[in-house]
Amino acid sequence: MTISTLSSSYGNAQDVPAEDSDRHGSIEPGSEKAANAVERSGIPILEVKNLCHRYPHLDANTLEEINLKVYKGERVAVLGANGAGKSTLFKHLNGILKPLSGEVLVKGEKITKKNVRMCRETVGIVFQDPDDQVLAPSVEEDIAFGPINMGLSSEEVEKRVKEALKMVGLEGFEERAPHHLSGGQKKLVAIAGILAMRPEVIVLDEPTAGLDPLSSARFLELIMKMNKELGITLLLSTHDVDVVPYFAERVFVLHHGKLEADGIPEEIFSDPELLRKAHLRLPRIAEIFEMLQQEGVDINIKITAEKARDEILRVMDSRFQTFRMG
């Protein structure tokens, strides 16, 4: 099916209800700017103030007085055990859910009924289960859905679909039926659908869940590329602590709907008690270093393989020098 046929099938954005046309999240052009060093000053691209949320069937709040800021170009991990409130928080970031109290600001503007479409054109969301998001009969139709409903020309829609497919490595999949794809491939289609709308922020809910180690690594490489080459601000939720050191510049820790910590990965993972309180653990590499500390070895906890190597070499050199002097 051609893009022009797709356009006539879907109609214009003005003819489609907001809740339908925004099912992918959305975007505003601007992703062509190269990623620059993040400056945590000025107006945050996302800000959450005193956010509380409660589902109707529950007696307690799912989110309790959440306050956080995310700045343009950052890569942020939201770390928490299952049930910590990560998905609920993410659904507030472009107005899918409404707060019980508090507010969410996108580029300094509070999300309201009047501007929710603009907010969804800035913040795109990739859901944990791609079957909740990839719904069209073909890959091409699914990726074209958002751009068509932005009112773009057939030529521009086709261009964006091709660019998005190339970015996620699915060239040649245009006519494939999504239900014939693997789980990992469906997640890539979901991301392509968001990329085609060129958002400034992409929120990914447990993106590596259900993926094998190789697919998970490739997925992380892709989203790092999106950040570095397109300048897209990224928020990623996960309970996989081994993923975080290789992705995040900053980490939020959620526990029972409360924000327990906000810091760089080295700070967060140097506090084992914080992680245990949040029903998490140290990354495997850091666990080894913690055990060495408990054995009396004078060694600093490291969280990536490269830094662990450097620290081990430092300790070995120090002991060698001590041995020579003795």
UniProtKB/Swiss-Prot annotation:
Its EC number is 7.-.-.-. GO terms for molecular function: ATP binding; ATP hydrolysis activity; ATPase-coupled transmembrane transporter activity. It is a peripheral membrane protein. It comes from the Archaea. One of its GO terms (biological process) is cobalt ion transport. It is an enzyme of class 7 (translocase). ATP binds at G80, A81, N82, G83, A84, G85, K86, S87. It is found in: Cell membrane. Residues 46-281 form the ABC transporter domain. Keywords: ATP-binding, Cell membrane, Membrane, Nucleotide-binding, Translocase, Transport. Residues 1-12 have a biased composition (Polar residues). Gene3D superfamilies: P-loop containing nucleotide triphosphate hydrolases. GO terms for cellular component: ATP-binding cassette (ABC) transporter complex. Residues 1-34 are annotated as: Disordered. InterPro entries: AAA+_ATPase, ABC_transporter-like_ATP-bd, ABC_transporter-like_CS, ABC_transpr_CbiO/EcfA_su, Co_trans_ATP-bd, ECF_ABC_transporter_ATP-bd, P-loop_NTPase. Its main location: membrane. Belongs to the ABC transporter superfamily. PANTHER family: ENERGY-COUPLING FACTOR TRANSPORTER ATP-BINDING PROTEIN ECFA1, HEAVY METAL TRANSPORTER. Probably part of an ABC transporter complex. Responsible for energy coupling to the transport system. This is Putative ABC transporter ATP-binding protein MA_4020. It comes from Methanosarcina acetivorans (strain ATCC 35395 / DSM 2834 / JCM 12185 / C2A).
